């Protein structure tokens, strides 16, 4: 299935400024993410950034990327990666049914299999009822369940998201043994696939109170009654780089996996 990967690459980060230029085994993180994207069947990769520095670094690597990769400067006042992608979609005038993969610039451990999984959801017979496709993986460590930097998701029996939160969801009462319940919690992996016509609807919605409280833009989708399908994949050790500590862990895992 034809799909285009767009990587929103904002330079500023309140918890880790300039993280997209942080070193991952000898290369800036944004370059590592692009390299991962190139292992997929995508027809095009667009880096959407508000940073001249990021743009120059990506352009410097053009010779090794081939003609699949482009980088575009965007406005700096976008409140989310989805808003930044919307600017690019309008600029390129993609067709309404074009599938877009929103790949975060701080996901250097992402795999082609994970990306293909969220795209393949749109081949399902029930895909007409799905607005957005994303991923999750079981959590097996208590410190991750209570970590507000790790977003949790609860799904129904059909794999549809009920809620996303930085808090521990579902809550476990004192009548349960945590060690016996490990694996019921799901860690959200922040990559998304959707069609351009969904993005047009999304941009017409205002921020919901839940989105403001949790600082999670995907809650705007649930608030407006649309469906997010969550593919649950086991044995994924994917880490978003949000802090210097997570950068250290990613460097260790990247060295092992490569």
Swiss-Prot record:
- The answer to whether keyword Transferase applies is yes
One GO biological process this protein is involved in is: lipopolysaccharide biosynthetic process
Q: What is its EC number?
A: 2.7.7.38
Q: Does the keyword Transmembrane apply?
A: no
Question: Sorted alphabetically, which keywords does the UniProt record give?
Answer: Cytoplasm, Lipopolysaccharide biosynthesis, Nucleotidyltransferase, Transferase
Q: Where in the cell is it found?
A: Cytoplasm
Give the first-level EC class, as a single word: transferase
Q: Give me the reactions it catalyses.
A: 3-deoxy-alpha-D-manno-oct-2-ulosonate + CTP = CMP-3-deoxy-beta-D-manno-octulosonate + diphosphate
Pathway per the UniProt entry? Nucleotide-sugar biosynthesis; CMP-3-deoxy-D-manno-octulosonate biosynthesis; CMP-3-deoxy-D-manno-octulosonate from 3-deoxy-D-manno-octulosonate and CTP: step 1/1; Bacterial outer membrane biogenesis; lipopolysaccharide biosynthesis
Q: Which InterPro entries match?
A: Cytidylyl_trans (IPR003329), KdsB (IPR004528), Nucleotide-diphossugar_trans (IPR029044)
Query: Coiled-coil region(s) at which residues?
Result: none
Q: Which GO terms describe its molecular function?
A: 3-deoxy-manno-octulosonate cytidylyltransferase activity
Give the GO cellular component terms, alphabetically.
Answer: cytosol
Query: Transmembrane segments in this chain: where?
Result: none
As for family, the record states: Belongs to the KdsB family.
What does the function comment of this entry state?
A: Activates KDO (a required 8-carbon sugar) for incorporation into bacterial lipopolysaccharide in Gram-negative bacteria.
Protein name (Swiss-Prot/TrEMBL): 3-deoxy-manno-octulosonate cytidylyltransferase
Its gene is kdsB
């Amino acid at each position: 299935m034809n799909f285009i990967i767009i990587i929103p690459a904002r330079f500023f980060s309140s918890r880790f400024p300039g993280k997209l230029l942080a070193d991952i085994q000898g290369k800036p993180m944004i370059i590592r993410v692009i390299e991962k994207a190139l292992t997929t069947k995508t027809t095009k990769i667009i880096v959407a950034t508000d940073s001249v520095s990021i743009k120059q670094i990506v352009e410097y690597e053009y010779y090794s990327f081939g003609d699949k990769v482009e980088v575009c400067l965007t406005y700096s006042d976008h409140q989310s990666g989805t808003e930044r992608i919307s600017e690019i979609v309008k600029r390129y005038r993609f067709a309404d049914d074009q599938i877009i993969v929103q790949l975060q610039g701080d996901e250097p451990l992402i795999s082609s299999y994970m990306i293909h999984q969220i795209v393949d959801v749109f081949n399902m017979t029930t895909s007409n009822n799905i607005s957005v496709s994303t991923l999750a993986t079981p959590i097996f460590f208590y410190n991750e369940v209570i970590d507000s930097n790790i977003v949790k998701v609860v799904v129904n029996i059909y794999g549809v998201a009920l809620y996303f939160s930085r808090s521990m969801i579902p809550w476990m009462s004192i009548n349960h043994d945590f060690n016996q319940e490990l694996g019921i919690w799901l860690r959200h992996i922040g990559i998304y696939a959707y069609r351009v016509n969904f993005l047009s609807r999304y941009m017409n919605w205002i921020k919901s109170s839940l989105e403001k409280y949790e600082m999670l833009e995907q809650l705007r989708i649930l608030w407006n009654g649309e469906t997010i399908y969550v593919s649950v994949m086991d044995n994924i050790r994917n880490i978003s780089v949000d802090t210097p500590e997570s950068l250290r862990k990613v460097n260790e895992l990247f060295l092992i996996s490569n």
